[in-house]
């Protein structure tokens, strides 16, 4: 993949880099591959969130790097930089990797590391579980794993060492880091983890044993969404929800703090 971007005074920045195709609603994302020139001059859309901003086509990341290798010849791995993949906060219902406070240019230039900030699906689009084997939730966490996969496959071209990735985040990002530590899908994809707050960012929210099961999460998060979309009695609830107006899904479930279930990261 080739990208068109720009540099600031002390680092290069690649904005709005697609790491996954537009995801199927309530389906798991896969890494994006392309040999076409991709513009990386502006941030990609944030993920759909209240009050109705953003898009479901939102799986973009941003790369800030102090060093770009010459990719026309074999890359000197000794010159590659350590990588921080930063996961934004926002209670799993808001925020994006393009929020100004997550701009990684200063850290890249002063810390001599590559900084990656990511979007991931939020609210019901990222975490709504159905109490069946078809749609088990945690699509937002799966997006984070997909971002890790993309970074591992491509970050050398941006000056980063795929074998030296640290995952980090604050608030919901810190919860994500803890969840990824317990996710089999993320094993071996990073070398260090740095949760930068407690589980909620503001106060103690209990132990990891308090993460709900899929059944508990479905009862709390899914019931109001099914009711609002008239999908409660559908033969296939997931198909019904996929056809529903995204704004209706958002308004029904977008303010409910998703209950991340470690169990559902195992599907």
Q: Could you describe each region identified by the protein language model?
A:
Residues 1-79, 261:
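Catalytic-loop region of hydrolases
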């Amino acid at each position: 993949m080739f990208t068109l971007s720009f540099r600031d005074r002390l680092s290069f920045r690649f904005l709005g880099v697609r790491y996954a195709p537009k995801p199927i609603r309530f389906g798991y994302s896969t890494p994006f591959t392309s040999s076409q020139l991709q513009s990386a001059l502006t941030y990609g859309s944030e993920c759909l969130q209240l009050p109705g901003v953003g898009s479901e086509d939102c799986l973009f990341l941003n790369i800030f790097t102090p060093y770009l290798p010459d990719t026309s010849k074999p890359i000197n791995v000794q010159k590659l930089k350590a990588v921080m993949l930063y996961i934004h906060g926002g209670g799993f219902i808001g925020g994006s990797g393009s929020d100004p406070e997550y701009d990684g240019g200063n850290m890249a230039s002063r810390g001599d590391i590559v900084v990656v900030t990511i979007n991931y699906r939020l609210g019901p689009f990222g975490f709504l579980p159905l109490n069946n084997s078809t749609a088990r939730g945690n699509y937002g966490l799966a997006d984070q794993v997909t971002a890790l996969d993309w970074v591992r496959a491509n970050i050398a071209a941006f000056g980063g060492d795929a074998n030296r990735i640290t995952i980090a985040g604050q608030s919901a990002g810190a919860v994500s880091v803890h969840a990824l530590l317990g996710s089999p899908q993320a094993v071996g994809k990073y070398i260090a983890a740095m949760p930068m707050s407690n589980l909620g960012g503001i106060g103690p929210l209990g132990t990891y044993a308090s993460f709900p099961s899929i059944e508990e999460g479905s009862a709390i998060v899914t019931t109001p969404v099914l009711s609002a979309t008239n999908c409660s009695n559908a033969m296939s609830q997931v198909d019904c929800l996929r056809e529903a107006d995204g704004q209706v899904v958002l308004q029904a479930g977008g303010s409910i703090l998703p209950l991340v279930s470690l169990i559902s990261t195992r599907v």
